[in-house]
Amino acid sequence: MLIAAFTVALSGLTYTAPAAWHTRPPASSMRVAEFVVPKAQGDSDNAELIIYYFGAAGGGGAEANVDRWINQVQQPDGSPTKAKARRAERTINGLKVTTVDVSGTYTAEMSPGAAEHYNKPAYRLCAAVVETPQGAYYIKMTGPEKTVAAAQPDYEKFLTSLKFQ
């Protein structure tokens, strides 16, 4: 539910975020915005949504990032995650947006280049590459499957609010 949402501008990219998502200071210079997405009833963890921007030519292409995100999730039965990932391309307010949605055990590095990895079973990753005239923005939401499913309508409204000015 999108109630009392707020609009933010980041170097030309604007979006409207749900009021239920709480902002927090970015943990690194690669992150331009971070949100805590409140946990669903019965879940022990909140989800998080992070927006990354690496400059006009940084961050790699859409497919490389989608593949990297897919590889951050493992299937409990050992089957290939790539076969279960849902990918899509669409245009939102004139911007090319590539999305991926995948569930499983979240095993991303705890920080770039770290030897330690998360081990979060029953997690879901929803991510998007938003291509703008000033370079791509990378949006990634991760959290317990139930929490991310509950946040899905707000996430979709958030994506459709993206504009570049």
Region spans (language model):
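N-terminal helix-cap/turn-to-beta initiation motif at the start of protein domains
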Residues: 9-16
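Surface-exposed amphipathic alpha-helical segments
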Residues: 19-21, 133-165
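Solvent-exposed, acidic/flexible segments
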Residues: 42-44, 58-63, 119-122, 144, ...
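Second-shell loop/turn segments in exported
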Residues: 50-59, 86, 140-149
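Solvent-exposed coil/turn segments that connect beta secondary-structure elements
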Residues: 54-56, 103-107, 134, 144
